[in-house]
A protein has these predicted regions:
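Hydrophobic, aromatic-lined core segments that form the binding pocket/scaffold
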Residues: 17-230
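Glycine/tryptophan-enriched, flexible segments
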Residues: 11-12
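Short, small-residue-biased leader/transition segments that mark boundaries at the very start
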Residues: 3-8
Length: 230
């Protein structure tokens, strides 16, 4: 129902906006919550969804996500392969503007073409820069909030709760990678205008096309994120 959808959405947004915890933990919590809600939905146990929502608000849920991430931490090689694969999925979408394809190819080259160790180095350097110089973590959080808000509306009607939340997480990941690529291109600089420009270009390609939104959702159903990997 629409009321249930609003409750789930509100609770997820509450978790995402709680800055006492790292964004990584918050993402793990909303993926975990969506994963368990999906299970209840599939088994037609919607009456127990309240309990799922409450469980993911607790300290033990945060502890659980932290522990899972420690145990399931992908290797440098796996992380590079996973990131590259997720980025390449953007080529499966309908191309609306030529300059978008150019941006994707250039970004892919900058990020992934030098192998796993180079990608790890780039990611660590960017993270360090972002911490010191920029409010990119807050921008990423706001993007997630926006995407959950936008994508989640129909989730309870079509039963694709996990796919919709995964889509919000992957969309934010894609934009984060585009920021990272531009930062490399600029030799360690990224202006607020460029941050906004890349969000705009992504939205223009993906969100302004129903066909692309539908394709992306199908990809989410095909390539499910093991939620604890974040």
């Amino acid at each position: 129902s629409s009321a249930a959808s609003d409750v789930y959405k509100r609770q997820m947004l509450g978790i995402l906006q709680d800055r006492e915890h790292s964004l990584k933990i918050r993402v793990g919590l909303i993926l975990g919550m969506a994963h368990d809600l999906q299970g209840r939905f599939n088994r037609e146990q919607l009456f127990s969804c309240e309990e799922v929502i409450e469980r993911y608000q607790t300290k033990s849920a945060r502890k659980f996500v932290r522990k899972l991430w420690k145990e399931e931490k992908p290797s440098v090689q796996e992380r590079w392969e996973m990131a590259h694969k997720m980025f390449r999925e953007l080529y499966e979408l309908e191309l609306l503007r030529e300059d978008w394809d150019m941006l994707l190819m250039e970004s892919e080259e900058l990020l992934y073409s030098h192998g796993a160790d180079a990608y790890k180095g780039i990611s660590s350097d960017f993270k360090r820069w972002a911490k010191e110089e920029s409010n990119i973590q807050i921008q990423a959080e706001q993007l997630l909030v926006y995407f959950i808000f936008t994508y989640f509306c129909g989730a309870v009607y079509d039963g694709r709760i996990y796919a919709k939340v995964q889509m919000a997480v992957i969309s934010t990941f894609h934009i984060y990678e585009l920021w990272k690529a531009r930062w490399i291109k600029n030799e360690g600089e990224l202006t607020p205008e460029e941050i906004v420009e890349l969000v705009y270009r992504y939205s223009r390609e993906i969100e302004h096309s129903d066909k692309n939104l539908e394709r992306m959702e199908k990809m989410m159903l095909r390539d499910r994120l093991p939620w604890y990997r974040g």
